[in-house]
Design a protein with these regions (language model features):
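N-terminal helix initiation/capping motif
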Residues: 1-4, 8, 12-28, 86-89, ...
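Active-site charged/polar residues at nucleotide-handling catalytic sites that mediate phosphoryl
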Residues: 3, 45, 94
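Structural beta-sheet core signal
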Residues: 7, 78-80
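Anion (oxyanion) recognition and catalysis
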Residues: 23, 72, 93
Length: 141
């Protein structure tokens, strides 16, 4: 199973750079053109990573909180793209795992996403294991 990331970034240059870096690391990218599309995708599909541009902080927080509340994406790794003047504590408190500062540098983004990739290791089983409790006995013949 391949890893999949949802990318919401209105800046075409940054989106292209991130898409190339993710593709180099073997991560398939679903690019959302707007926050409504991203909200719909988060509600209906499972992603291994969400990469959200935080220029519109309210919409980014809405997507992040919806992901954290959904059964599909509650444990999904989140990377927030923020301006250097943004309050990153809010994003970390809402569950963001990584922050990339804009404007993006290719090398800095590559190193950060490589570190994030290590945390995205997918469960090799199709479904998680569920504990089962049943009475059992041992008989010696």
């Amino acid at each position: 199973m391949e890893l999949r990331a949802l990318l919401l970034c209105p800046d075409a240059r940054s989106a292209q750079l991130l898409g190339e870096i993710l593709a180099e690391q073997g991560i398939a990218v679903d690019q959302a053109s707007d926050s409504a599309t991203a909200l719909e995708s988060v509600a209906t599909r499972r992603f291994d990573a969400l990469i959200l541009d935080a220029d519109d902080e309210e919409r980014a927080k809405e997507i992040l909180s919806k992901a954290r509340l959904s059964a599909l994406n509650s444990g999904t790794l989140v990377v927030a793209l923020v301006a250097s003047t943004s309050n990153v504590r809010q994003f970390f408190s809402m569950g963001a795992n990584f922050v990339l500062y804009k404007p993006l540098s290719g090398e800095r983004a590559r190193v950060s996403l490589k570190a994030a990739r290590a945390l995205m290791r997918r469960e090799p089983r199709r479904a998680p294991r569920i504990p089962v409790h049943a009475p059992a006995g041992i008989a010696y013949a």
